[in-house]
């Protein structure tokens, strides 16, 4: 890592801290030549490839905004959406691929959204899966009903203690 002050090539790490739920590392460095300190940020790159072929960095806020529309009028908080976006990012990163299709991001949204709010799940799935008839909705509802009670291996949802 080059020193931003004297451009010397050698620096030593003085301190490291994990940020953003472990997806980034902040390092405090000291130049071996001039002794000045500077901060660097390290993150692993995760790129989303859209249908058009355009590649862009993964952005949690896009996940939140897409799901927020499906959750309008539902008892879903901003914290719930932030946790869902974090889970989606963790799922996508767990594939080990530096590039993922936008379609795969959408698939990663479906299960956590189903657990969060079934009505929002139906709204999102109807657009994402391109529902064309009532039969498509009935099929999705049947999936939801079949999945009820089968929460093995899924994180528990903490009940709300206070309502707003």
Swiss-Prot record:
Protein name: Transcriptional repressor NrdR
Biological classification of the source: Bacteria, Bacillati, Actinomycetota, Actinomycetes, Micrococcales
Cofactor(s) listed in the protein's UniProt record: Zn(2+)
Superkingdom to which the source organism belongs: Bacteria
Keyword tags: ATP-binding, DNA-binding, Metal-binding, Nucleotide-binding, Repressor, Transcription, Transcription regulation, Zinc, Zinc-finger
Binding note for cofactor: Binds 1 zinc ion.
GO MF annotation list: ATP binding; DNA binding; zinc ion binding
GO biological process, one term: negative regulation of DNA-templated transcription
Function according to Swiss-Prot or TrEMBL: Negatively regulates transcription of bacterial ribonucleotide reductase nrd genes and operons by binding to NrdR-boxes.
Zinc finger boundaries on the chain: unnamed: 3-34
Domain ATP-cone: 46-136
Organism: Micrococcus luteus (strain ATCC 4698 / DSM 20030 / JCM 1464 / CCM 169 / CCUG 5858 / IAM 1056 / NBRC 3333 / NCIMB 9278 / NCTC 2665 / VKM Ac-2230)
Family: Belongs to the NrdR family.
Pfam family, one: Zn_ribbon_NrdR
